[in-house]
Amino acid sequence: MSTTASQQGLTARAPALASWLDAHAETLDTDATLSGEVVPQLASAGLLRVGVPVELGGTGGTIGDAIDSVADVAAHSFAAAFVLWGQRTFIEYLLQSPNQALRDRLLPALLCGELAGATGLSNAMKYLSAIEPLQIRATDVTTLSSSGVGGGDTSSWRVNGGLPWITNLRKQGFVAAAAVDHEAGGPPSIFAIAHDAPGVHRSDDLDLIGLRGTNTAALQMTDTPLREDDRITDNAPAWLVRVRPAFLGLQCGMSLGLVRRSLDATNEGGPAARSAVADDVAALTDQLASLTTRLKSGVLRGEFVDTPASLFKLRISLAELVHDAATLEVQTGGGRGYLRGLSGVARRQREAAFVPIVTPSLVQLKNQLAAQREQQLKTGTVT
Protein backbone atom coordinates (compact mmCIF):
# COMPACT_ATOMS: atom_id res chain seq x y z
CA MET A 1 0.00 0.00 0.00
CA SER A 2 1.41 3.39 -0.94
CA THR A 3 1.69 6.22 1.52
CA THR A 4 -0.98 8.23 -0.23
CA ALA A 5 -3.31 5.24 -0.31
CA SER A 6 -2.79 4.73 3.43
CA GLN A 7 -3.65 8.33 4.25
CA GLN A 8 -6.61 8.33 1.87
CA GLY A 9 -7.78 5.12 3.56
CA LEU A 10 -8.03 6.78 6.96
CA THR A 11 -9.49 9.94 5.46
CA ALA A 12 -12.12 7.90 3.63
CA ARG A 13 -13.25 5.67 6.49
CA ALA A 14 -12.59 7.98 9.42
CA PRO A 15 -12.55 11.55 8.07
CA ALA A 16 -13.22 13.17 11.44
CA LEU A 17 -10.31 11.32 13.04
CA ALA A 18 -7.98 12.06 10.12
CA SER A 19 -8.78 15.77 10.32
CA TRP A 20 -8.36 15.82 14.10
CA LEU A 21 -4.99 14.06 13.90
CA ASP A 22 -3.71 16.36 11.17
CA ALA A 23 -4.77 19.41 13.17
CA HIS A 24 -3.25 18.23 16.44
CA ALA A 25 -0.30 15.99 15.49
CA GLU A 26 2.23 18.57 16.67
CA THR A 27 0.45 19.12 19.97
CA LEU A 28 0.16 15.38 20.63
CA ASP A 29 3.91 15.12 20.19
CA THR A 30 4.99 18.15 22.19
CA ASP A 31 2.66 18.37 25.20
CA ALA A 32 -0.04 16.55 27.15
CA THR A 33 -2.89 18.99 26.56
CA LEU A 34 -4.91 16.52 24.49
CA SER A 35 -3.69 13.29 26.07
CA GLY A 36 -7.10 12.46 27.49
CA GLU A 37 -8.81 12.76 24.11
CA VAL A 38 -6.79 10.29 22.04
CA VAL A 39 -8.43 7.03 23.12
CA PRO A 40 -12.00 8.41 22.75
CA GLN A 41 -11.12 9.75 19.29
CA LEU A 42 -9.77 6.36 18.21
CA ALA A 43 -12.84 4.66 19.65
CA SER A 44 -15.25 7.02 17.89
CA ALA A 45 -13.60 6.10 14.59
CA GLY A 46 -14.13 2.41 15.35
CA LEU A 47 -10.43 1.57 15.23
CA LEU A 48 -10.39 -0.20 18.60
CA ARG A 49 -12.86 -2.78 17.27
CA VAL A 50 -10.88 -3.72 14.15
CA GLY A 51 -9.79 -7.36 14.20
CA VAL A 52 -12.04 -8.13 17.17
CA PRO A 53 -14.72 -10.80 16.59
CA VAL A 54 -18.21 -9.41 16.02
CA GLU A 55 -19.64 -11.60 18.76
CA LEU A 56 -17.30 -9.89 21.24
CA GLY A 57 -18.28 -6.37 20.19
CA GLY A 58 -15.80 -5.86 17.38
CA THR A 59 -16.21 -5.28 13.66
CA GLY A 60 -14.49 -8.49 12.63
CA GLY A 61 -11.46 -8.79 10.41
CA THR A 62 -8.01 -10.04 11.33
CA ILE A 63 -4.96 -8.95 13.26
CA GLY A 64 -3.59 -7.90 9.87
CA ASP A 65 -6.42 -5.36 9.60
CA ALA A 66 -5.53 -4.07 13.06
CA ILE A 67 -1.90 -3.66 11.95
CA ASP A 68 -3.15 -1.64 8.97
CA SER A 69 -5.17 0.58 11.32
CA VAL A 70 -2.08 1.36 13.40
CA ALA A 71 -0.15 2.15 10.22
CA ASP A 72 -2.93 4.41 8.93
CA VAL A 73 -2.94 6.41 12.16
CA ALA A 74 0.87 6.61 12.28
CA ALA A 75 0.88 8.29 8.87
CA HIS A 76 -1.00 11.19 10.51
CA SER A 77 0.31 11.07 14.11
CA PHE A 78 2.89 8.69 15.53
CA ALA A 79 1.83 9.62 19.07
CA ALA A 80 -1.77 8.60 18.40
CA ALA A 81 -0.54 5.39 16.77
CA PHE A 82 1.54 4.65 19.87
CA VAL A 83 -1.61 4.97 21.98
CA LEU A 84 -3.57 2.81 19.53
CA TRP A 85 -0.83 0.17 19.73
CA GLY A 86 -1.08 0.11 23.52
CA GLN A 87 -4.88 -0.03 23.57
CA ARG A 88 -5.28 -2.58 20.79
CA THR A 89 -2.48 -4.77 22.15
CA PHE A 90 -4.14 -4.91 25.56
CA ILE A 91 -7.39 -5.86 23.83
CA GLU A 92 -5.46 -8.63 22.07
CA TYR A 93 -4.25 -9.88 25.44
CA LEU A 94 -7.85 -10.34 26.52
CA LEU A 95 -8.76 -12.04 23.25
CA GLN A 96 -5.97 -14.55 23.81
CA SER A 97 -6.59 -14.99 27.54
CA PRO A 98 -8.29 -18.12 28.87
CA ASN A 99 -9.98 -15.92 31.49
CA GLN A 100 -13.37 -15.32 29.88
CA ALA A 101 -14.78 -13.57 32.95
CA LEU A 102 -11.99 -10.99 32.82
CA ARG A 103 -12.58 -10.48 29.11
CA ASP A 104 -16.31 -10.02 29.63
CA ARG A 105 -15.67 -7.54 32.43
CA LEU A 106 -13.12 -5.30 30.69
CA LEU A 107 -13.61 -5.60 26.94
CA PRO A 108 -16.76 -3.44 26.50
CA ALA A 109 -15.19 -0.41 28.23
CA LEU A 110 -11.95 -0.87 26.29
CA LEU A 111 -13.70 -1.07 22.92
CA CYS A 112 -15.77 2.06 23.49
CA GLY A 113 -12.78 4.06 24.73
CA GLU A 114 -14.11 4.58 28.24
CA LEU A 115 -11.16 2.64 29.69
CA ALA A 116 -7.54 2.82 28.52
CA GLY A 117 -5.50 -0.36 28.18
CA ALA A 118 -1.75 -0.31 28.77
CA THR A 119 0.40 -3.24 27.66
CA GLY A 120 2.94 -3.01 30.48
CA LEU A 121 4.70 -6.10 29.15
CA SER A 122 7.97 -4.61 27.91
CA ASN A 123 9.62 -6.02 31.03
CA ALA A 124 7.96 -9.38 30.34
CA MET A 125 9.18 -9.45 26.74
CA LYS A 126 12.71 -8.76 27.96
CA TYR A 127 12.28 -11.51 30.56
CA LEU A 128 11.16 -13.91 27.83
CA SER A 129 14.39 -13.15 25.97
CA ALA A 130 16.48 -13.49 29.17
CA ILE A 131 17.39 -9.79 29.08
CA GLU A 132 16.15 -8.79 32.55
CA PRO A 133 14.26 -10.30 35.52
CA LEU A 134 10.64 -9.54 36.27
CA GLN A 135 10.19 -6.42 38.38
CA ILE A 136 6.97 -7.26 40.22
CA ARG A 137 6.62 -9.96 42.87
CA ALA A 138 3.48 -11.62 44.23
CA THR A 139 2.93 -13.05 47.70
CA ASP A 140 0.18 -15.64 48.01
CA VAL A 141 -2.37 -14.58 50.63
CA THR A 142 -5.06 -17.11 49.74
CA THR A 143 -7.40 -17.98 52.60
CA LEU A 144 -10.09 -20.61 52.95
CA SER A 145 -13.62 -19.23 52.68
CA SER A 146 -15.72 -19.34 55.83
CA SER A 147 -18.07 -21.88 54.26
CA GLY A 148 -15.37 -24.52 54.17
CA VAL A 149 -17.21 -26.09 51.24
CA GLY A 150 -15.20 -27.64 48.43
CA GLY A 151 -14.21 -25.01 45.91
CA GLY A 152 -14.23 -22.35 48.60
CA ASP A 153 -10.56 -21.49 48.12
CA THR A 154 -10.17 -18.14 46.35
CA SER A 155 -6.66 -17.53 45.07
CA SER A 156 -5.41 -14.07 45.97
CA TRP A 157 -2.10 -12.26 46.12
CA ARG A 158 -0.48 -9.02 47.14
CA VAL A 159 1.98 -7.63 44.65
CA ASN A 160 4.88 -5.23 45.04
CA GLY A 161 7.13 -3.66 42.44
CA GLY A 162 6.96 -1.29 39.55
CA LEU A 163 7.41 -0.61 35.88
CA PRO A 164 9.38 2.48 34.84
CA TRP A 165 7.75 3.15 31.48
CA ILE A 166 4.18 2.36 30.38
CA THR A 167 2.19 4.11 27.68
CA ASN A 168 -1.55 4.83 27.74
CA LEU A 169 -1.90 5.26 31.50
CA ARG A 170 -4.81 7.60 30.86
CA LYS A 171 -5.59 9.68 33.93
CA GLN A 172 -9.33 9.24 33.41
CA GLY A 173 -8.99 5.48 33.98
CA PHE A 174 -6.76 2.64 32.86
CA VAL A 175 -5.96 -1.02 33.31
CA ALA A 176 -2.39 -2.24 32.81
CA ALA A 177 -1.06 -5.70 32.04
CA ALA A 178 1.95 -6.68 34.14
CA ALA A 179 4.00 -9.85 34.49
CA VAL A 180 4.42 -11.01 38.07
CA ASP A 181 6.90 -13.43 39.62
CA HIS A 182 5.46 -15.62 42.37
CA GLU A 183 7.28 -15.75 45.70
CA ALA A 184 6.00 -19.31 46.14
CA GLY A 185 7.57 -20.42 42.86
CA GLY A 186 6.04 -21.73 39.67
CA PRO A 187 5.56 -19.95 36.34
CA PRO A 188 5.09 -16.18 36.43
CA SER A 189 1.57 -14.85 35.86
CA ILE A 190 0.22 -11.86 33.99
CA PHE A 191 -2.40 -9.75 35.72
CA ALA A 192 -4.67 -6.89 34.72
CA ILE A 193 -4.05 -4.13 37.28
CA ALA A 194 -6.68 -1.41 37.59
CA HIS A 195 -5.79 2.24 38.13
CA ASP A 196 -7.97 2.43 41.23
CA ALA A 197 -6.74 -0.76 42.91
CA PRO A 198 -5.31 -0.17 46.41
CA GLY A 199 -1.59 0.54 46.39
CA VAL A 200 -1.40 1.49 42.70
CA HIS A 201 0.46 4.74 42.05
CA ARG A 202 0.89 6.40 38.66
CA SER A 203 3.79 8.84 38.40
CA ASP A 204 3.64 12.16 36.62
CA ASP A 205 4.13 11.86 32.88
CA LEU A 206 7.71 11.09 31.93
CA ASP A 207 9.63 14.10 30.59
CA LEU A 208 9.95 12.83 27.02
CA ILE A 209 11.36 14.84 24.12
CA GLY A 210 8.36 13.81 22.02
CA LEU A 211 5.20 11.67 22.20
CA ARG A 212 4.21 13.73 25.23
CA GLY A 213 0.49 13.29 24.61
CA THR A 214 0.63 9.51 25.09
CA ASN A 215 0.09 9.29 28.87
CA THR A 216 3.47 7.64 29.34
CA ALA A 217 4.42 7.27 33.00
CA ALA A 218 5.79 4.87 35.60
CA LEU A 219 3.57 2.57 37.64
CA GLN A 220 4.24 1.40 41.19
CA MET A 221 2.37 -1.26 43.19
CA THR A 222 2.59 -1.48 46.98
CA ASP A 223 0.76 -4.42 48.59
CA THR A 224 -1.78 -4.26 45.78
CA PRO A 225 -4.40 -7.00 46.19
CA LEU A 226 -5.13 -9.18 43.15
CA ARG A 227 -7.45 -12.13 42.69
CA GLU A 228 -7.81 -14.99 40.27
CA ASP A 229 -10.36 -13.03 38.25
CA ASP A 230 -7.67 -10.39 37.57
CA ARG A 231 -5.28 -12.94 36.06
CA ILE A 232 -4.80 -12.87 32.27
CA THR A 233 -2.72 -16.06 32.32
CA ASP A 234 -1.13 -18.33 34.91
CA ASN A 235 1.76 -19.30 32.62
CA ALA A 236 3.38 -16.14 31.33
CA PRO A 237 6.29 -17.72 29.38
CA ALA A 238 4.09 -20.04 27.32
CA TRP A 239 1.42 -17.39 26.76
CA LEU A 240 3.92 -14.66 25.81
CA VAL A 241 5.37 -16.85 23.06
CA ARG A 242 1.90 -17.02 21.49
CA VAL A 243 1.02 -13.35 21.92
CA ARG A 244 4.42 -11.86 21.00
CA PRO A 245 3.74 -11.85 17.23
CA ALA A 246 0.65 -9.67 17.74
CA PHE A 247 2.53 -7.43 20.21
CA LEU A 248 5.37 -6.84 17.76
CA GLY A 249 3.20 -6.92 14.65
CA LEU A 250 1.00 -4.10 15.90
CA GLN A 251 4.10 -2.23 17.05
CA CYS A 252 5.62 -2.59 13.58
CA GLY A 253 2.46 -0.99 12.20
CA MET A 254 3.75 2.30 13.61
CA SER A 255 6.89 1.98 11.48
CA LEU A 256 4.87 1.13 8.38
CA GLY A 257 2.81 4.29 8.69
CA LEU A 258 5.79 6.53 9.42
CA VAL A 259 7.68 5.23 6.39
CA ARG A 260 4.65 5.78 4.16
CA ARG A 261 4.26 9.36 5.34
CA SER A 262 7.94 10.21 4.92
CA LEU A 263 8.03 8.73 1.43
CA ASP A 264 4.88 10.61 0.50
CA ALA A 265 6.47 13.83 1.76
CA THR A 266 9.30 13.46 -0.75
CA ASN A 267 6.72 14.30 -3.43
CA GLU A 268 6.20 17.69 -1.81
CA GLY A 269 9.70 18.85 -2.74
CA GLY A 270 10.59 20.69 -5.92
CA PRO A 271 11.06 18.93 -9.27
CA ALA A 272 14.85 18.85 -8.94
CA ALA A 273 14.69 17.35 -5.45
CA ARG A 274 12.15 14.74 -6.49
CA SER A 275 14.26 13.75 -9.47
CA ALA A 276 17.40 13.45 -7.36
CA VAL A 277 15.85 10.90 -4.99
CA ALA A 278 13.42 9.16 -7.36
CA ASP A 279 15.43 5.94 -7.54
CA ASP A 280 15.88 5.86 -3.77
CA VAL A 281 12.18 6.44 -3.18
CA ALA A 282 11.28 3.66 -5.60
CA ALA A 283 13.66 1.24 -3.88
CA LEU A 284 12.34 2.07 -0.41
CA THR A 285 8.75 1.77 -1.63
CA ASP A 286 9.48 -1.73 -2.93
CA GLN A 287 11.14 -2.67 0.37
CA LEU A 288 8.14 -1.36 2.29
CA ALA A 289 5.71 -3.42 0.21
CA SER A 290 7.79 -6.56 0.70
CA LEU A 291 8.20 -6.09 4.47
CA THR A 292 4.51 -5.29 4.90
CA THR A 293 3.48 -8.48 3.13
CA ARG A 294 5.93 -10.61 5.11
CA LEU A 295 4.89 -9.05 8.42
CA LYS A 296 1.14 -9.48 7.99
CA SER A 297 1.44 -12.93 6.46
CA GLY A 298 3.73 -14.17 9.22
CA VAL A 299 1.50 -12.87 12.02
CA LEU A 300 -1.70 -14.16 10.40
CA ARG A 301 -0.32 -17.63 9.73
CA GLY A 302 1.31 -17.97 13.12
CA GLU A 303 4.77 -18.42 11.58
CA PHE A 304 6.47 -16.15 14.12
CA VAL A 305 5.36 -18.23 17.10
CA ASP A 306 7.92 -20.90 16.27
CA THR A 307 10.42 -18.63 14.47
CA PRO A 308 10.59 -15.39 16.50
CA ALA A 309 14.00 -14.61 14.98
CA SER A 310 12.28 -13.96 11.65
CA LEU A 311 10.05 -11.39 13.32
CA PHE A 312 13.02 -9.80 15.09
CA LYS A 313 14.78 -9.40 11.74
CA LEU A 314 11.66 -7.82 10.24
CA ARG A 315 11.48 -5.34 13.11
CA ILE A 316 15.13 -4.40 12.56
CA SER A 317 14.62 -4.01 8.81
CA LEU A 318 11.60 -1.77 9.35
CA ALA A 319 13.51 0.44 11.79
CA GLU A 320 16.26 0.85 9.21
CA LEU A 321 13.63 1.66 6.60
CA VAL A 322 12.16 4.32 8.89
CA HIS A 323 15.58 5.95 9.18
CA ASP A 324 16.20 5.88 5.43
CA ALA A 325 12.77 7.28 4.56
CA ALA A 326 13.01 10.05 7.16
CA THR A 327 16.43 11.00 5.80
CA LEU A 328 15.06 11.26 2.27
CA GLU A 329 12.26 13.49 3.53
CA VAL A 330 14.82 15.85 5.07
CA GLN A 331 16.83 15.93 1.85
CA THR A 332 13.88 16.78 -0.37
CA GLY A 333 12.37 19.27 2.09
CA GLY A 334 15.50 21.37 2.28
CA GLY A 335 15.63 24.41 4.54
CA ARG A 336 11.84 24.59 4.69
CA GLY A 337 11.83 21.55 6.93
CA TYR A 338 14.04 23.38 9.44
CA LEU A 339 11.52 26.19 9.93
CA ARG A 340 8.92 25.89 12.66
CA GLY A 341 5.30 25.42 11.67
CA LEU A 342 5.81 24.85 7.96
CA SER A 343 5.89 21.05 7.89
CA GLY A 344 6.00 17.94 10.03
CA VAL A 345 9.58 17.10 9.09
CA ALA A 346 11.08 17.87 12.51
CA ARG A 347 8.35 15.93 14.29
CA ARG A 348 8.86 12.89 12.09
CA GLN A 349 12.59 13.04 12.78
CA ARG A 350 11.82 12.77 16.50
CA GLU A 351 9.35 9.97 15.80
CA ALA A 352 11.90 8.12 13.69
CA ALA A 353 14.47 8.44 16.49
CA PHE A 354 12.09 6.63 18.84
CA VAL A 355 11.62 3.55 16.65
CA PRO A 356 15.02 1.93 17.43
CA ILE A 357 14.58 2.25 21.20
CA VAL A 358 10.99 1.14 21.80
CA THR A 359 11.02 -2.28 23.49
CA PRO A 360 12.32 -4.56 22.21
CA SER A 361 15.03 -2.14 21.09
CA LEU A 362 17.25 -2.84 18.12
CA VAL A 363 20.22 -3.38 20.42
CA GLN A 364 18.27 -5.98 22.40
CA LEU A 365 17.09 -7.73 19.26
CA LYS A 366 20.56 -7.79 17.70
CA ASN A 367 22.04 -9.21 20.89
CA GLN A 368 19.30 -11.83 20.96
CA LEU A 369 19.99 -12.84 17.36
CA ALA A 370 23.74 -12.92 17.99
CA ALA A 371 23.27 -15.17 21.03
CA GLN A 372 21.03 -17.46 19.03
CA ARG A 373 23.56 -17.71 16.22
CA GLU A 374 26.37 -18.42 18.68
CA GLN A 375 24.30 -21.23 20.16
CA GLN A 376 23.59 -22.62 16.71
CA LEU A 377 27.30 -22.60 15.89
CA LYS A 378 28.02 -24.54 19.06
CA THR A 379 25.37 -27.14 18.29
CA GLY A 380 25.95 -27.27 14.55
CA THR A 381 22.36 -26.26 13.75
CA VAL A 382 23.05 -23.10 11.72
CA THR A 383 20.54 -22.74 8.89
Predicted regions and their residues:
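A generic N-terminal leader/anchor concept
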Residues: M1-G60
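Glycine-rich beta->alpha junctions and the first turn(s) of the following alpha-helix
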Residues: L206-A289
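Glycine-rich flavin
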Residues: L34-S44, L48-N160
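Glycine-rich phosphate/cofactor-binding loops in nucleotide/flavin-utilizing enzymes
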Residues: R336-T383
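C-terminal helix-coil-helix/basic helical segment that borders enzyme active sites and/or dimer interfaces
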Residues: D22-T30, P271, A289-H323, T327-R340
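Generic structural signal for well-ordered, non-transmembrane alpha-helical segments
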Residues: G257, A282-A289, F312, I316-H323, ...
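A generic local secondary-structure boundary/capping motif
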Residues: R105-P108, M125-L128, Q135-R137, L163-T167, ...
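A short core secondary-structure module
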Residues: G162-V200
